[in-house]
Amino acid sequence: MEPRVVDDPEELRYELWLGADLAGEIRYTREKDGTVVLVHTDVDPSHKGEGLGNVLVQGTLDDLRQRGIGYHVVCPFVARYLARHPQPG
């Protein structure tokens, strides 16, 4: 099944879904100017090692970019991902 990354603004998180199962999330906060601060990434232990954290980060960054929303990173996992996978713009 194809993973889906969706924003849940009420919960302030991006969610990674595999079918009906929530497999991971990136928690965030919002600055007054609308900038998103990516705070923490978590993947369900039953899916560790499957590369879903990377899928979640890239899906989150793609969505933010498509919507024209700036972001800052404090999550170490996202920071490591960005060091290995530079983003456009």
Per-region residue spans from a language model:
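Active-site rim helix/loop that mediates acceptor-substrate recognition in acyltransferases
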Residues: 1-13
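Conserved beta-hairpin
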Residues: 13-23
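Conserved beta-strand in the GNAT
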Residues: 21-29, 37
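Conserved acetyl-CoA binding element of GNAT-fold acetyltransferases
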Residues: 35-44
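Conserved acetyl-CoA pyrophosphate-binding loop and the N-cap/start of the following alpha-helix
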Residues: 47, 51-56
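Conserved acyl-CoA
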Residues: 55-70
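Catalytic nucleophile loop
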Residues: 71-76
